[in-house]
Amino acid sequence: MSSSLQELCRKKLPDCILPEFFDDYVLQLLGLHWQDHGSLQRIEKNQILVQQEPIHINEALKVAASEGNYEIVELLLSWEADPRYAVVGALESKYYDLVYKYYDLVKDCHDILPLIQNPETFEKCHELNNPCSLKCLFKHAVIHDMLPILQKYTYFLDGWEYCNQMLFELACSKKKYEMVVWIEGVLGIGKVTSLFTIAISNRDLHLYSLGHLIILERMQSCGQDPTFLLNHFLRDVSIKGLLPFVLKTIEYGGSKEIAITLAKKYQHKHILKYFETGKC
């Protein structure tokens, strides 16, 4: 069969029901047979049938690329599959000829990183963008929950205060709580109080509570009294009228009297009403 006729069949036939008498040989001639998988048919924009079983087209593309099956990759791309999945599949199986061919369709490794679950593949993908530094890798590891990458480079990060502080604050901003705890506990952070600024700004009560646990553990391990610091944060959230944060600070040892005094001063009636009803 001529290549032009095959191309026409690959484009037009998949949107129709394939005749039952089309055996593997005919499908191979039409370019609609996937070795070891079976017949291919497009049924929707994002769905195909593989041997009559539905599968998302991008998942099929990832598998085809992981097998190094150039013909099927090209077919699925012509059906509007996302080329990022071709790069991921090829990276996982180390088909670097396919990686570089289809990476040109994407151009930026950072657009591919959210699709990757494996830390080794994640790092290999990031290396495709030559100008990027290790600091950039660490930053995206935080954003995409790739803690194993930070663990791998602990020796490199140890003592790099500026980078560790940046990663810590990024983890706080992105609500990556496991990262927050690990970075503070393993790498060490000079300015933990930035956590509270971010938590209050983003109204993130979980992060705010986590910050208190970190601060209390730090100060108690050094034999220090946390009361002054707790009341410092309490004043901040009381002035802003943030009742859930006020209550959380009191729970950890902040002064209820300070909260009531500031609520009166700044006329936060909802806070006053809460305490007047005797709930705390």
From Swiss-Prot:
Any matching Pfam family: DUF249
Keywords: Early protein
InterPro entries in UniProt: MGF_505 (IPR004858)
Induction remarks: Expressed in the early phase of the viral replicative cycle.
Protein family per UniProt: Belongs to the asfivirus MGF 505 family.
Annotated function: Plays a role in virus cell tropism, and may be required for efficient virus replication in macrophages.
Protein name: Protein MGF 505-3R
